[in-house]
Amino acid sequence: MCTNIVYEWLKALQLPQYAESFVDNGYDDLEVCKQIGDPDLDAIGVLAPAHRRRILEAVRRLREQDANAAGLYFTLEPQPAPPGPPADAVPTGRRGEPCGGPAQGTRGDSRGHTTAPRSRELVSYPKLKLKIMIRDKLVRDGIHLSKPPYSRKVPMAGILEYLMNWPKSSQSR
């Protein structure tokens, strides 16, 4: 069985039986899954109407989450409520910029220019969803945590040589 984000997504929808078909048809990432429609479900082999509805509804939610994700900040632990901020105060992000302010959308994308109202409250995410969001962001940004500068390989030959040359005095005991 495949072990990736699409499998976890289908498992959450209680439809893990389609995971292998999704991957075989090229739907191995949630970004790709956001494009799924009825013809795609036919090709994947999702024939049950209830399963099709569940998947299409989940795809719609994925698209909405992507549209609402621009400019959101989150915390891993809940923070105590501040003592009565003024009603006209604008929450600030990590860098002191106002959330939803001019810092959004400066990378050339149109996500910062949506007209839908957004909540300025802190959002709590379940652990799995947060892991998925972080993984997707790392993939989008081309960051590989298993490669330098984020990690380095320890040469196996060096470890073996060290163990082979372990002090002879400790072996004679």
From Swiss-Prot:
Alphabetical UniProt keywords: Cytoplasm
A Pfam short name: SAM_1
Subcellular location: Cytoplasm
InterPro entries from the UniProt entry: SAM (IPR001660), SAM-SH3_domain_protein (IPR051725), SAM/pointed_sf (IPR013761)
SAM domain: residues covered: 1-65
Gene3D superfamilies referenced in this protein's UniProt entry, alphabetically: Transcription Factor, Ets-1
SUPFAM superfamilies: SAM/Pointed domain
Annotated Pro residues bias: 79-88
UniProt GO BP: regulation of intracellular signal transduction
SMART domains per UniProt: SAM
Residue ranges of the TM segments: none
Region (Disordered): 75-119
GO cellular component: cytoplasm
Main location per the UniProt record: cytoplasm
Entry comment describing in which tissues the protein is expressed: Detected in biliary epithelial cells on bile ducts at the hepatic hilum (at protein level).
Subunit structure: Interacts promiscuously (via SAM domain) with EPHA5, EPHA6, EPHA7, EPHA8, EPHB1, EPHB2, EPHB3 and EPHB4 (via SAM domain) (in vitro).
PANTHER family assigned to the protein according to its UniProt record, in alphabetical order: SAM-DOMAIN, SH3 AND NUCLEAR LOCALIZATION SIGNALS PROTEIN RELATED (PTHR12301), STERILE ALPHA MOTIF DOMAIN-CONTAINING PROTEIN 5 (PTHR12301:SF8)
Full protein name: Sterile alpha motif domain-containing protein 5
Organism: Homo sapiens (Human)
Lineage, uppermost ranks: Eukaryota, Metazoa, Chordata, Craniata, Vertebrata
